[in-house]
Amino acid sequence: MSLNKVRASEYRRIFVNDHPIMDARAPVEFEKGAFPASVNHPLMEDEERKKVGTCYKERGQEAALKLGHSLVHGEIKQQRVDAWLDFFSKNPDGYLYCFRGGLRSQLTQQWLKEAGLDIPFIEGGYKAMRQFLIETIDDAPNMKPMLILSGITGSGKTDFLLKRKEAVDLEGLAHHRGSSFGRYHEPQPSQINFENALAVALLKHQDSAAKHLLLEDESYLIGRSALPQAFYTGMQAAGVLVLEESLDARLARLLNEYVHKMHSGYIQRLGEEAGFEAFAQYLAQSITGIKKRLGNKQHDEFQAIITNALNIQTSQNDTSAHLEWIELLLVKYYDPMYQYQIDKKADRVIFKGDHQAMHQWLDNH
């Protein structure tokens, strides 16, 4: 009997088009890592998978299959099949996959067929698709010339990148702005999910008309998301564009990012009182994160200024007092650190300019 399956040559199309895919692996496998367009509807739950796996090791495939059928039958089986049918009724052109494209895919496909649906499963499963994405990231520096957008903290690099078709937003994929104050409200993805999302973004970029791959200047770690080594090495060799911005514009932008956006985001999630408490904690923890570099005395000064700004914000509904510690943070910490970093890249800098000049340069190159 020939199996209805999607060949490995189709992986690129699946990812570029965000093709709907049903992941039949157990929840514990899905949580470790999955693909951006995938939805988990398992054949077996975690404990069932564990029992079947142990049986397979001790007694072989036939005994494991028998045990699997005894664990997933009757009403439990019907509930699982109903969930699959619901997914494919909403995504009639969808595919399914398991870890290797083996027995679990075939069994899921068989049960769906018995229920009246013939759904293709993906050859090679999660393991082969994941390997394809890893290779995509490793090959990316050779696909299109990389350009690195650098700029002093608060210069608006992310705002600029989001307006450019050449760009892939690494910080957006990592859910982190890459600095002590860079935390998002949403948690960061797992390392595997970060890499998978990056690879899919790169595949889409490769299929676009963009001549360059424009990336923000990042360190190896963006929060706790690590850039894959070959990709990061490519970034370290790429030409650098330096985005320039006035101090006043930088202060206004950082007041909005560190104070207005974070405060409103916490309140949205937690309510007025708990949200403000979480916001105050975010500021305190962010300063504590750079305590070693600041030194105890300067760290304590920052905490006092932040506490005063929070008190004024509460009593007068005025956030402008936060500008004092933000400016101090730039002068004492971010700007000297940036200058040190950009001096090391001086031989790679190919253009400097403000937002308008940078857009014009990229439009012409």
Swiss-Prot record:
Cite the EC number: 2.9.1.3
Q: What role does this protein play?
A: Involved in the post-transcriptional modification of the uridine at the wobble position (U34) of tRNA(Lys), tRNA(Glu) and tRNA(Gln). Catalyzes the conversion of 2-thiouridine (S2U-RNA) to 2-selenouridine (Se2U-RNA). Acts in a two-step process involving geranylation of 2-thiouridine (S2U) to S-geranyl-2-thiouridine (geS2U) and subsequent selenation of the latter derivative to 2-selenouridine (Se2U) in the tRNA chain.
Give the residues annotated as active site: C98 (s-selanylcysteine intermediate)
Arranged from A to Z, the UniProt key words for this protein are: Selenium, Transferase
**Annotated organism of origin:** Shewanella halifaxensis (strain HAW-EB4)
* Protein name (record): tRNA 2-selenouridine synthase
Looking up HAMAP family in the UniProt record yields: tRNA_sel_U_synth
| Rhodanese domain boundaries | 15-138
Top-level enzyme category: transferase
Instruction: Show the InterPro entries listed in the entry.
Output: Rhodanese-like_dom, Rhodanese-like_dom_sf, SelU
Spell out the molecular function terms from Gene Ontology.
transferase activity, transferring alkyl or aryl (other than methyl) groups; tRNA 2-selenouridine synthase activity
- Which family, according to the similarity comment? Belongs to the SelU family.
* GO BP field: tRNA wobble uridine modification
Catalysed transformations (reactions) = 5-methylaminomethyl-2-thiouridine(34) in tRNA + selenophosphate + (2E)-geranyl diphosphate + H2O + H(+) = 5-methylaminomethyl-2-selenouridine(34) in tRNA + (2E)-thiogeraniol + phosphate + diphosphate; 5-methylaminomethyl-2-thiouridine(34) in tRNA + (2E)-geranyl diphosphate = 5-methylaminomethyl-S-(2E)-geranyl-thiouridine(34) in tRNA + diphosphate; 5-methylaminomethyl-S-(2E)-geranyl-thiouridine(34) in tRNA + selenophosphate + H(+) = 5-methylaminomethyl-2-(Se-phospho)selenouridine(34) in tRNA + (2E)-thiogeraniol; 5-methylaminomethyl-2-(Se-phospho)selenouridine(34) in tRNA + H2O = 5-methylaminomethyl-2-selenouridine(34) in tRNA + phosphate
Specify whether Transferase is a keyword of the entry: yes
> What do we know about how this protein assembles, alone or with others?
Monomer.
